[in-house]
């Protein structure tokens, strides 16, 4: 049994060490959101605020007990989503006509990525609001367990936030490239119509190749999206399993502590029950011995003398 507990502790410590190493790596990631597009800068401010919250310093713990943190996060979320929408509209204005099917597909993928990022940011705010309610309910008690669960959930949410932010960044790049490519195809079509008749034959072969390329790109995007979705689900499940192991360990330790306290209380209760009974039996036995000795005429303090 001790060996199993030792193996479990080693496994959990190894997981914690991996979390610390990954924490350092993720802490360096926000640099990519600096001094670029306005939406990336807004996301960078949200990220920096989240990293400050994760320190769980005394100042953070104090401010988490009121609604100031969640209100500021709400403003940062609204600012980020506003900048994303503005950037998308700017891209649409900069380019010419695009194939309706391609535009619908790219726009749908972009909206889904934007929705995932917004959901991640809202999850952070919701989790902090939940912690505030739990901490206020446990005011005056030990909140180490609440802080441990909050830190674990924030690590998980931050990894998901980074992953979906990178996905949105890629989708915007694909959207920009797709619209620019459509504009270039429009220029090529004008050259085709105004070109000499002798070039008409070769130019007519271009549209089918472009259609094939569009289909290949669409198929590639679909496959890549599915692979990313599967990978994301696998990472989320691993994170869930790790969180469940941590919660299970905490519950087992708590139950073991309760069992130990109950056993000690039961032992004390048994002692309080039987100790008076034993003392009473000792008194009764001593009294019985005295009565027997008195009846036989034997003094309890002297031995009977031998008669000659």
From Swiss-Prot:
Gene3D superfamilies reported for this sequence: Apolipoprotein (1.20.120.20), Apolipoprotein A-I (1.20.5.1230)
Signal peptide (from-to): 1-18
Region (8 X 22 AA approximate tandem repeats) residue spans: 75-246
Functional note: APOE is an apolipoprotein, a protein associating with lipid particles, that mainly functions in lipoprotein-mediated lipid transport between organs via the plasma and interstitial fluids. APOE is a core component of plasma lipoproteins and is involved in their production, conversion and clearance. Apolipoproteins are amphipathic molecules that interact both with lipids of the lipoprotein particle core and the aqueous environment of the plasma.
Region (Homooligomerization): 257-308
Known partners and oligomeric status: Homotetramer. May interact with ABCA1; functionally associated with ABCA1 in the biogenesis of HDLs. May interact with APP/A4 amyloid-beta peptide; the interaction is extremely stable in vitro but its physiological significance is unclear. May interact with MAPT. May interact with MAP2. In the cerebrospinal fluid, interacts with secreted SORL1. Interacts with PMEL; this allows the loading of PMEL luminal fragment on ILVs to induce fibril nucleation.
Gene for this chain: APOE
Sequence repeats: 75-96, 97-118, 119-140, 141-162, 163-184, 185-206, 207-224, 225-246
Key words, A-Z: Chylomicron, Endosome, Extracellular matrix, Glycoprotein, HDL, Heparin-binding, Lipid transport, Lipid-binding, Oxidation, Phosphoprotein, Repeat, Secreted, Signal, Transport, VLDL
Binding site for heparin: 157-160, 220-227
Similarity-based family: Belongs to the apolipoprotein A1/A4/E family.
Residue span of region LDL and other lipoprotein receptors binding: 153-163
GO BP term, pick one: acylglycerol homeostasis
Protein name: Apolipoprotein E
